[in-house]
Amino acid sequence: MFQDNPLLAQLKQQLHSQTPRAEGVVKATEKGFGFLEVDAQKSYFIPPPQMKKVMHGDRIVAVIHTEKERESAEPEELIEPFLTRFVGKVQGKNDRLSIVPDHPLLKDAIPCRAARGVQHEFKEGDWAVAEMRRHPLKGDRSFYADLTQYITFADDHFVPWWVTLARHNLEKEAPNGVATEMLDEGLERQDLTALNFVTIDSASTEDMDDALYAEELADGRLQLTVAIADPTAWIAEGSKLDNAAKIRAFTNYLPGFNIPMLPRELSDDLCSLRANEVRPALACRMIISADGTIDDDIAFFAATIESKAKLAYDNVSDWLENNGTWQPDNEGIAQQIRLLHRICLSRSEWRHHHALVFKDRPDYRFVLGEKGEVLDIVAEPRRIANRIVEESMIAANLCAARVLRDKLGFGIYNVHTGFDPANADALAALLKTHGLHVDAEEVLTLEGFCKLRRELDAQPSGFLDSRIRRFQSFAEISTEPGPHFGLGLEAYATWTSPIRKYGDMINHRLLKAVIKGEAIARPQEDITQQMAERRRLNRMAERDVGDWLYARFLNDKAGTNTRFAAEIIDVSRGGMRVRLVDNGAIAFIPAPFLHAVRDELVCSQENGTVQIKGETVYKVTDVIDVTIAEVRMETRSIIARPAA
């Protein structure tokens, strides 16, 4: 009799609308219970039985119950699941398979089966890609997943690489395809094969995309010609190879190997500016005054060049510093190195005064064995030869930015607008507490930003610099010319790495249109989004593989007294993150390792400090000695403690 009773339905509706609810994100703990985080201030307890319906990271709506003044959340509706596509390790065999997601806070095995069309017979320990098919909040009895791709077996030495690439859905190998002959682009190429062009790279580099040639003019000024590899001479816009490069957007550099944007035949051979091989190039000629200013008379042109020497950073640096035994092959090459060194010094000086120069940080290189084992991690400081190439490339990219802006009004630009205007007042207030006075309006201009950066660089430590980093906006890729505050330049458009960056290939095509005096369409906006997304994924992949290799490398140091110098890079409520100076590994120091009495300890992310009994004991940028307490291989995390 109550079946279709409208009064009962109304009562139910009323009760439903009067019951308090909250939307938020589920945070799991290792103890079975969890929390519904509504915002930074408010969270609700989720009891263990209710946690069985949800997963860490799910965005849900929950009913809020109050019992004996204690609030708890009962998950009711799924807004957005945390897991859709994921990688994990298979458990069980035959018909009873499950998969444990490869995530530090997801420990439970999810029942699964191989999806239709997947041929592999999965067994214990296999790595796989899975997709969620069922969720308790969608009316299903339990969680369930399909295995959509086999990655590799448990003991594969190269698990870090294959699993990471599968996780981010990135390619594992070079694209297929060959370029049979050069295109007829209607370009006249200047024959520069007689000139002493040189390339300077790491000794192991195969994809050389820049060659340099310098000469001194009669009036004492220096003329620099930057010749860049010319893949668009082989790859037509809209072709199969072009579309593959557009999707990849960048060569993906991972520890130990790279996955190129172009077929290796092009990237490492046909386009690579190899010594004593004639190659097509796109070139830029500029004149540099004694104070480092680049003349307005910038020339872009198509050329044919022949590099006369493949030089290595360390050899060139040693020779300029009068160290080591290496010598240039002949006086012509020696003269090139000397002239390029002069250009580097004057451009560096100009950028110090008129733009901004980054602080030098070492690059960390993993030395790997045949089986992917980490033999060593080497810190490679940026030396004078690295700076020669860097200054030449920045100058060339500045020239391209100007020419594209003035001739076309568009291009692929790297744009960075400094501080977010919404943060300007908070930034000025923070700086004031440290004795630096800035105008909140002025600091949003390129000039004001540069002025502040120079003041910060003059500080005795990088502490204040680290405090204001959170107020900065992110660099973007844009088709519209705009300033690059980080470099302190009015505009910046890269074209010097077309073998490894699709945006540089686009700029090549635009520059060629300028050279020929032809009209050309503005690049589509969606390409900048694809490039930004790929850059993000490639960086995450590099970090993930690095974390895995660092954990392998430091595993045997866990629990020993081996000391490492470490720079504090972040403070949070739970402790501090540090970077080991010698190898670049990131480790976490939990708060209890800093001081045993929790009430006497204040870890402030806001201030970047750790206080014990009111005294600041640690702050961001401090370098301290640590030992490795534990390496958790399953989550690739390194736990350190201050050395006694």
Swiss-Prot record:
Its EC number is 3.1.13.1. GO terms for cellular component: cytosol. The keyword Heme does not apply. InterPro entries: CSD (IPR011129), NA-bd_OB-fold (IPR012340), RNase_B_OB_dom (IPR013223), RNase_II (IPR011804), RNase_II/R (IPR001900), RNase_II/R_CS (IPR022966), RNase_II/RNase_R (IPR004476), RNR_Ribonuclease (IPR050180). Pfam families: OB_RNB, RNB, S1. Residues 189-516 form the RNB domain. Residues 561-643 form the S1 motif domain. GO terms for molecular function: exoribonuclease II activity; RNA binding. GO terms for biological process: mRNA catabolic process. Its main location: cytoplasm. It comes from the Bacteria. It is found in: Cytoplasm. It catalyses: Exonucleolytic cleavage in the 3'- to 5'-direction to yield nucleoside 5'-phosphates. Keywords: Cytoplasm, Exonuclease, Hydrolase, Nuclease, RNA-binding. Involved in mRNA degradation. Hydrolyzes single-stranded polyribonucleotides processively in the 3' to 5' direction. PANTHER family: EXORIBONUCLEASE 2 (PTHR23355:SF37), RIBONUCLEASE (PTHR23355). NCBIfam families: 3_prime_RNase, PRK05054.1, RNase_B. Belongs to the RNR ribonuclease family. RNase II subfamily. This is Exoribonuclease 2. It comes from Salmonella heidelberg (strain SL476). The gene is rnb.
